[in-house]
Amino acid sequence: MKGIAFVGKSWLILTVAGLTFSQVLAQETKSGIPLDQSWKETVYAFAANNLQHTAWGLEHSERDYQLARALAAGDGLEIDEDVLFAAAFLHDMAAFEPYAVAGEDHSNTGADKAGAILEPAGFPMAKLPSVQAAIRAHMYYAEVPAEPVAQVLHDADTLNFLGAIGVTRIISLTTREGLAKDLPAAVATLENFSRELPASLVTATAKAMATDRVQEMESFLAALRQQSVDGRAL
């Protein structure tokens, strides 16, 4: 805690582990997601302490949650907020040690292991199958069930590979992951994503958003080609 001050009846803002004091008092995440149940506080703390990464860490989960809610609203879908919160903040847990299993898709492994985090946190475990279904379906290549939370989380996660945020995420992986082992590989991944990912979207709202995000990526890639001797000097 860096400092705290009380002036009259007003608290001054301070920073506590990356959160402002006003957020701590309001019990919300950095992006304003309410932590209105104790199990949510526990799950969020787990993600903050264990799932840090430039491309699929805590902030990515916050974006997925917020965007999934917007997609549900846009398509008029009723979603279970508990299921969405749990799935959004745990969907990539098996991309991290010690939860990863070599040779297994992190979506399936994460779905299998999510209960071990949720049950001691006090999550309503009758909803676990829906959380697991959403986690299994979150990747762009996954088959998506008819459950609304699975659909909007899948689309939110896919949209997060497109647009300016998609470019930022993939470039951040350069030299660290196979899909971006160097800059030319990162650019090839971005080109493939801009062409192929929109077709995997389910909701009408996501499909509409994808149009703008693909245009953003194509503009970036065109400028990059122009500034790198048609990509030969990356």
Labelled PLM ranges:
Residues 33-34, 50-62, 66-78, 90, ...:
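Divalent metal-dependent phosphate-bond-processing catalytic cores, especially two-metal-ion Mg2+/Mn2+ enzymes
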Residues 81-100, 106, 110, 130-139:
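His-Asp-centered metal-binding catalytic motifs of divalent-metal-dependent phosphohydrolases/nucleases
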Residues 47-51, 72, 93-101, 118, ...:
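Short amphipathic alpha-helical interaction patches enriched in hydrophobic/aromatic residues
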Residues 64, 106-119:
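An active-site-proximal "capping" alpha-helix that borders the catalytic cofactor pocket
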Residues 10-22:
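Bacterial N-terminal signal peptides
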Residues 1-12:
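Bacterial N-terminal signal peptides that target proteins for export
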